[in-house]
Amino acid sequence: MAFECDKSGATYDDALMKLRLFTALALTFTLITPATASHNFIVGGDRPVTVHLPDTLANPAPLLILLHSASTSGARLESYMKIAPVAKSQGLIYIAPDGNTNAEGKRFWNASKSCCNRYSQEVDDVAYIDALIDEISAKTPVDPKRIYLIGHSNGAFMSFTYACKTDKVAAIVAIAGAMDQNPECAPTTPVSLLNIHGTADKVIKLNGGVMNNNSYTSATNTVNTFISVNRCAQATALKKDFDPIITGAETTIYDYVCGTHAELQFWKIKDGAHKPNLPSDFAQLVISFLLKQSK
């Protein structure tokens, strides 16, 4: 049975073939072209967190997780660091989750023996962060090679613990944090680190200390752990005016040369406090560091 032709001589089969080709091309274009992000959404079950999508959502897109200090919240740390607007404009999926609450009603991350599970609650925050990443990845395209953490104090402890116990993290920015003495940290792939610590920090001391009857490392030994992970050599040092309140170039930046593709920097703020004064471009500085890193 012959198919009828239109006036141009094209058959029904010709038209069907063109339609299939157009559909395939449209699908390919959709998969490889960044799209305008849809609405934010909620994940996390009984510890819900809003997933903030960027202005332009790449396929896949990097994921940034902000981890707060003890007794605060993701919202309060966001208010301090102002990460969200830069993450949105720079194409990052962004979350600022909350830790569990203890017997005093204060939030914490069960990061290590020293920080900051004061009541020895049965909380697996590594599994919680894993679940957040998995749930977000099921709903929007997350790049598994570009998962980043920013943590302050207890959140920095949690960032170190998560990076050491999983192979999901490409890079960390840690402010005023540390690790337990003799940490077990052996990720199978390099983890870039920007470690920021003030010499006048009275909460998490630069030279190490004791919390919850357990010792935590000095900032130098914390960095040494990642020198080993990333096979880094001696650092070059330069001065920077980072803290807008402290006069002069108060911050020494130690920039290490590593035998992997990872980057390692230690920013030591002379007279810097536990909650340092941040410059107006802080979010841009740390996100620029993170976006250079990949697994």
Regions found by a protein language model. Give the residues of each.
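C-terminal catalytic histidine-bearing segment of alpha/beta-hydrolase fold enzymes
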Residues: 192-196, 227-295
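Serine-hydrolase catalytic machinery in alpha/beta-hydrolase-like enzymes
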Residues: 40-148, 158-161, 280-283
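Bacterial N-terminal signal peptides
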Residues: 24-30
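The conserved beta1-alpha1 loop
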Residues: 65-71, 176, 197-198, 270
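Acidic beta-to-alpha connecting loop that harbors the catalytic carboxylate
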Residues: 99, 199-202, 209-210, 270-273
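Conserved alpha/beta-hydrolase "acid-adjacent" motif
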Residues: 202-207, 211-218, 277-279
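Sec/Tat signal peptide C-region and signal peptidase I cleavage site
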Residues: 32-37
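Primarily recognizes the serine-hydrolase "nucleophile elbow" in alpha/beta-hydrolase
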Residues: 137-190, 202
